[in-house]
């Protein structure tokens, strides 16, 4: 079986099954700038190309733990329709699933893991998996959370899968908070309303009643709602607790100062003050997925899509610690491929998380946040040169403490000797992640997947799904939903 590197985010080098620490030399900044890529906004639907290592040996991106794309894709398939290409973000489908990465053992905020195997899709190519596992904080370790719920109660939120579901999700979240946490509630439609100021958990009944009284009507003044939510959040901002605005909406905004760039600018400014944003999307039809994702990205938070109570339970109960508690911020990954070993590479997904190579060590450049217990997985397609030897790739991770301003860097080499001899010899989690990646590439009609087969994806997923694993079994069922839809597209 191919090896998987296990390295704590606190250390600098590692391989095999150990957690190591120590210093290491770093290449000069000029070297990184020489291979710099663009950091301009990536248009929706863009697919990362293959890159020659002689032109750019460095791949740099911000982590992403959002999962909204999987839930939204699932909703489309269950309703008998293919999602739009731009809705399918490969990294969010892959990161939706749980993988058994060992946790850090030396007190660091995360551990880094790597493994690789031949590609089951394209002969002569390999797949490299890079994973991060965040440290899990206990309930007692979690900081007090001061949450401001910003709820869209406009007319577009009337259907059962929107405001009624959002209310049930909020009640579930409140029931999983603890002493020391507070909740404020702001709504927006044609105007904005402060429903409840910061309220402690000793008054849960009052919070539940305020949520239950919410009704939908009118137009959508999102911009004004965000401003009032921040005013409420400032009341409990103390520099030591979690301060987060949670926006629940279908993303529509049609009244008020709703310039999208203006809203994003306000959110970026509030992040510097210590208030982050999580977005939770509801509904289908006119749902503005891209808008909700951008709000969360600029707010240093997460983007979720909730289509059922099961999905709400996952976000607000099972993964509440990760939803609320950041253990590392501005987390960047940079993978350096050895041109003597690797001819070309392609990062699958993360198109809207790309960072210029020269900005990897610029601590002023924003990146992604890692929550308690969160995992991050990235997959690369590689074309190796004949007789690839030792130094296949080096993974560098930079991250700041939750309230820090200076990042630390860890370095993790991956050697060609750690490659699995065959895809069947690869670890079960790598095989399943490959199946999810393959399905996502097919669903977004990636040009790199022209010769890939949904049958191959299904066979891989089936062989890497343990009996009783409900999440993976659901994925298998979704593949069957996708089959006739993809065939219909191919026949046109």
Model-inferred region functions:
Residues 1-39, 45:
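Intrinsic-disorder/low-complexity signature in envelope-associated proteins
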Residues 84-99:
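Extracytoplasmic
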Residues 111-331, 385-389, 402-404, 476-488, ...:
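Exposed acidic/Ser/Thr-rich ligand/metal-binding surfaces
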Residues 2-8, 14, 38, 211, ...:
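Exposed boundary/loop context
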Residues 28-76, 81-87, 104-112, 120-128, ...:
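An acidic, Ser/Thr-enriched
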């Amino acid at each position: 079986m191919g090896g998987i590197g296990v390295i704590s985010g606190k250390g600098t080098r590692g391989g095999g099954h150990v957690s190591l620490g120590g210093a290491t030399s770093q290449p000069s900044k000029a070297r990184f700038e020489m291979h710099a890529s663009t950091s301009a906004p990536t248009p929706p639907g863009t697919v990362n190309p293959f890159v020659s290592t002689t032109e750019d040996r460095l791949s740099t991106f911000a982590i992403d733990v959002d999962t909204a794309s999987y839930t939204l894709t699932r909703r489309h398939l269950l309703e008998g329709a293919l999602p739009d290409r731009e809705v399918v973000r490969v990294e969010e489908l892959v990161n939706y699933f749980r993988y058994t990465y060992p946790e850090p053992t030396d007190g660091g905020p995360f551990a880094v893991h790597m493994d690789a195997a031949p590609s089951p899709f394209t002969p002569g190519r390999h797949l490299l998996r890079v994973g991060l596992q965040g440290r899990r904080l206990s309930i007692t370790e979690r900081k007090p959370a001061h949450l401001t719920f910003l709820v869209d109660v406009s007319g577009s939120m009337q259907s059962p899968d929107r405001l009624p579901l959002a209310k049930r999700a909020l009640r579930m979240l409140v029931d999983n908070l603890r002493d020391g946490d507070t909740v404020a509630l702001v709504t927006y439609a044609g105007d904005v309303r402060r429903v409840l100021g910061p309220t402690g958990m000793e008054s849960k009944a009052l919070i539940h009643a305020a949520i239950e009284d919410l009704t939908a009507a009118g137009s959508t003044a999102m911009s004004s709602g965000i401003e009032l939510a921040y005013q409420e959040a400032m009341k409990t901002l103390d520099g030591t607790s979690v301060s987060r605005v949670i926006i629940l909406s279908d993303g529509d905004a049609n009244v008020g100062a709703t310039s999208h760039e203006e809203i994003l600018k306000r959110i970026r400014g509030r992040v510097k003050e210590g208030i982050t944003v999580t977005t939770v999307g509801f509904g289908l039809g006119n749902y503005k997925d891209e808008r909700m994702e951008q709000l969360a990205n600029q707010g240093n938070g997460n983007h979720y899509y909730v289509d059922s109570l099961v999905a709400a339970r996952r976000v607000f109960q099972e993964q509440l610690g990760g939803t609320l508690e950041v253990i590392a911020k501005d987390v960047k990954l940079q993978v350096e491929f050895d041109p003597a070993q690797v001819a070309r590479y392609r990062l699958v997904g993360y198109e809207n998380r790309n960072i210029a190579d020269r900005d990897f060590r610029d601590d002023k450049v924003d990146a992604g946040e890692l929550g308690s217990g969160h995992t991050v997985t990235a997959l690369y397609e590689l074309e190796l040169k004949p007789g690839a030897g030792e130094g296949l790739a080096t993974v560098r991770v930079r991250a700041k403490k939750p309230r820090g301003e200076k990042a630390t860097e860890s370095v993790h080499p991956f050697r060609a000797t750690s490659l699995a001899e065959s895809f069947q010899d690869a670890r079960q989690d790598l095989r399943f992640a490959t199946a999810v990646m393959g399905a996502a590439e097919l669903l977004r009609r990636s040009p790199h997947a022209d010769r890939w087969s949904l049958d191959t994806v299904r066979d891989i997923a089936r062989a890497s799904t343990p009996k009783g694993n409900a999440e993976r079994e659901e994925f298998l069922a979704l593949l069957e939903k996708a089959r006739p839809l993809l065939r219909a597209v191919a026949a046109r």
